[in-house]
Every structure is written in structure tokens, then in C-alpha cells.
Amino acid sequence: ERGFSMVFQNYALFPHMTVRNNVGFGLRMQGVPAAQAGPRIDKAMAMVRLSDQQDKLPGQLSGGQQQRVAIARAIVTEPTLVLMDEPLSNLDAKLRQEMRQEIRRIHLQSGATTVYVTHDQEEALSLADRIVVMRDGRVQQVGTPGELFDAPIDLGVADFMGFRNRLPGRILARNGAAVTIGVRADTASPSDPHCGELTGRPRQDSLGDKVVIAVRPYDLTVQASGRPGLGVTVELTEYLGRGYQALGRTSDGQSVHFACDRLLSPGEQLVLAADPARALVYPA
């Protein structure tokens, strides 16, 4: 009656019905005659590439196939709106990536407006035309994936957009469009010594203000010895295939995640610098 369909996290397929009957269930509830329903079911099945599986039961399908059945059931009624509630959370990483591409393709082919709920940054960026970030029931920011990725409005949105490092400190100096931050966990007094410096892109902050600098791991680089920056002691290094990512700790105990080009040894002393254009500064 409301003109929208929903795809659930747990698929919610009828286990005793064939794939075809699951897809056509909404049409039967709407009283669509069989002669009209048949071609629409065929179209939806073809759209999700399951025409050859229509006589099977859901239990005979893989998780990805079951999810596609749920999507076909949602679009077969030709709704004006489709709501997808974390539909990929039960799938493994490889299948999630494949299904993201399938959902995008199906969305473009069906033309239905789709609201997709997710806690996954990659899903949001790859699927959305516009992203709405919400926290505690309130809208934090609305924009295109590029707008939110490059300029999150606050630390909450920055966290969702992959700014894994969020380090407190005070503004020490301004250099054109950038500021230098003295990083320190306890910023009670401007005269307190800091454990290192990072340069970032500020908003409307003044010298001496308490701030938080947010930076993604791959926007931190290892500096040559003697260069200014943020000193860390290496705790561990992970090999990620395309490179390495390390966890370091500052002299005042803050953890710092950063990219590197080799396997680092625990206890190794390094100095890190941030790309000023990619490190964002927020009020504390």
C-alpha cells in the first residue's frame, strides 16, 4: 500500500517456497493476475541473474544467491522506493564485494530510488549517489561520497570516513592555509611540552586553541631522521598485500596507525609527517 519494498539483513525468504514463488509473493499479495505477474517475475529473475535457479528452494542456494532472490522480490512489485537494511552483513568479504557491484548494477537497471542502511564505509562510498551520516538518531552531514570523504564536517563523520587517527593538541603556528599542531594527550596548559608536531588543514581556529587533528593512516609518511614531525615507537606491522600498515605509540601513550613500505621492527623509533592537505583540524 505504501509503494515501497524492503530487503532485510537476514533475507527473510520462505524456505518451503521455490525461488520463483518467493519472488512472486508480493505480486500475489497485490492481487496481480498470473498472466501479468509471470513476465514481471521473469524480468526480475533475469535482472538478478537467477533465471536458471527459479525451481530451487532457498536452502539449495548460496548466501549471495539468496540475497539476490530477496532483491528480486523487492523490485518485482516496481516500487517507488526500496529500503535495504544492511543486506550484506551476513556475507563474507569476497561475496560482499561481488554483491556491492550486483546491487549497484540492479539499482541502475531498475531505476528505483534506494535507501541503503550500512555501517560500512566502502559500501556507502561505492553504492551511494548521496550519503546521509547519522549519529544517535540525528543527521550529521549530507553530501556526495566525494564531499564527505574529503571534508567531513566533524569528528564523528571523519571517523566513519576512515580518519582512524584522531590526536589532540594545540595550534602552535599558522603557515598560509595550514597550521602546525603540537600533539599531546593532556592539553591542559599551552606551555606543556608536546610529543611531536603535525601539519593540517584548519577551520576557524586560532593560535593556542585546543584542537584534534584527524588523519588517515595512508596520509602519514615516515620522515628522514632529524626532520620535524610526530615521534612514535613501533609496536607492530601488518602486511596487507599492497603494502604495510603499522601501529606506533607516541611518548605520551597515544596510538598512531600509519602506512609504510617495509616490515618494521617492534621498538623502532620513527618520525611521521602528515600531508597538510589531507589532515583535518577540528575544535577539541
Give the location of each predicted region:
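ABC ATPase nucleotide-binding domains
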Residues: E1-D159
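Short beta-strand-centered aromatic/proline hotspots
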Residues: G169
